[in-house]
Amino acid sequence: MNMFLKLILTAVLSVIAALPLYSQQLFTGNAESFPPELESIYLKGLDYLQKSQNKTGQFQGQYGNAPGVIGLCVIAMLAHGDDPNSGKFNANIKLGINVILNSANKNNGYIGDSMYNHGFATLALAEAYGAVNDDRIGPALKKAVALIVSSQNRNSKGAWRYGPESQDADTTVSGSILVALFAAANAGIIVPDEAISKALNFYESCLTNDGGFGYSGKDSPNYPRTAIGALVFALAKKKDSGIFKNAITFLSTHSANDTGGQYYHYGLYYAAQAFFHAGTQPWEIWNEINIKTLKASQSENGSWNSSQGPAFTTAAALLSMALNYRYLPIYER
């Protein structure tokens, strides 16, 4: 076991029994407690996204035109805390939101060509709702949520997969959707309790004996899927459950590179939020190492890259550090 895993495991085991106590007093830090290199790394990444966005609101590189990826880039900008209507990135945020709104089906609210896109784009609308001055956001968000619920009601697993008509489900697509539902509920949109409970039941059906989460059943648990599972149970206010605690232990004893690096930054995006809910000490240790690792791997132009393209990868890397700012409603605990 490498030093990173040893540090995380030690921290987790020391506080895991006291998670309910921590939940009452988490995260009262301020800008003075940020890791000193955070701001320069984050701004360098945002500057890359700003420069790589074209006049239509899309981003350079693979998947940079996908509304879900554009949504994550918008969220990364919102997460820094600049005024979305007059700050440095306001034009970029509005361009991105415009792409998402124009990508939505006018009849049923479906955004893009996959539920992955729909989930991340819906999350962006939820985080922008009430912050970005655009009267179209509220109605589009309500339609997007209605499509999610209707899709789930038709799904035999009670969750989601690639299309709104899918009858099977997996933990990765469902994660993007379920987090969007929590964000929409935070924004004041009505989300049926049954939608959350059915989705959590699906996740329970994917639990493995070692505390991880499989893909579509009790199969092949890995770091990203388990980070997603931990997060959705945390957002459902089940941080005192054995499911959440065991998932955090799984993450603490496995490498973020356990998928061969292909989904490394994707896993960081979810793991950051999962550890954030696990308690001050585990998150601070994880966060410090994550920032140092991302600093060392950041390209000269400010981006990070992978097989998912520079826009998605950069947004995911930034969002894994964005909890330090705690400006987004979904990050308020």
Regions found by a protein language model. Give the residues of each.
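Bacterial N-terminal signal peptides that target proteins for export
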Residues: 1-9
